[in-house]
């Protein structure tokens, strides 16, 4: 009898401890987003305010466009890149071949590629600038330190010119040809709303080749993702997502998570704003050199817990941060 009494006491103490930890987390939740920091005065070292473009006598600093301006091209591609000097050229070559082919068939198909160098330690920056010398609609957004995949995507998506905005990974795991699948679907959704997202799904595609370990980890993370508030989506982590300009604006000025777990938060924000979300299969292949480690998985799980708690209790607010 004393033993079970002891177990009960331990249980209630455990619950109280968890409750205390959650309360402390909520009390210390930072509602500041990367968008807020981009509104800092000029001269503040934390402010990102220009692209880097090749110029005849060196590199030129080109002022950012803003997501709040009217679109001036049809499609913006946002590519987060961290130490991608080896894999980025192949992806860019394939992407450019596709874009040029579309452009030749349809002169109204205008585009830009925004590559966000997330504090790379290799020659990613130089690779991008070499391509930008040949293609003036390739832009480099250079983050001087590594801020995380989420921060890179957010910075890129807040400073694009496109009517449509496509997220894609630098490793080329998803082929650019599948853009047309997402494009057709989002145009259908845009008949009734200007806030829509179409996401690529590896889970629905039999062609996807994934190792048993990746499948096991994916199942575990998916369980946490459902608990964080994302329902009805089989694959949140695929880096192939297409946004309307309006959905891009509303989501990324409210995004808080700056590392690997940005994808579930993007969908949580979209759900809370009542956006239409569609999921379609895309061809995907696992690429050597993936950088997700066990420590990254732990950080991702922590961020999922924050998403689940902070968005539900209002510690992370969704609002028009321009005002």
Curated annotation (Swiss-Prot):
Q: How does it sit in the membrane?
A: Single-pass membrane protein
List where in the cell it is found: Endoplasmic reticulum membrane
One of this protein's Pfam families, by short name?
Glycos_transf_2
| Xref: Gene3D superfamilies | Spore Coat Polysaccharide Biosynthesis Protein SpsA, Chain A (3.90.550.10)
Gene Ontology, cellular component aspect:
endoplasmic reticulum membrane
The membrane spanning regions, by residue number, are 6-26
Q: What is its EC number?
A: 2.4.1.117
**Cytoplasmic face: residue ranges?**
27-323
Q: What PANTHER family does the record tag this protein with?
A: DOLICHYL-PHOSPHATE BETA-GLUCOSYLTRANSFERASE, GLYCOSYL TRANSFERASE
Task: List the protein's name.
Answer: Dolichyl-phosphate beta-glucosyltransferase ALG5A
Q: Which organism is it from?
A: Trichomonas vaginalis (strain ATCC PRA-98 / G3)
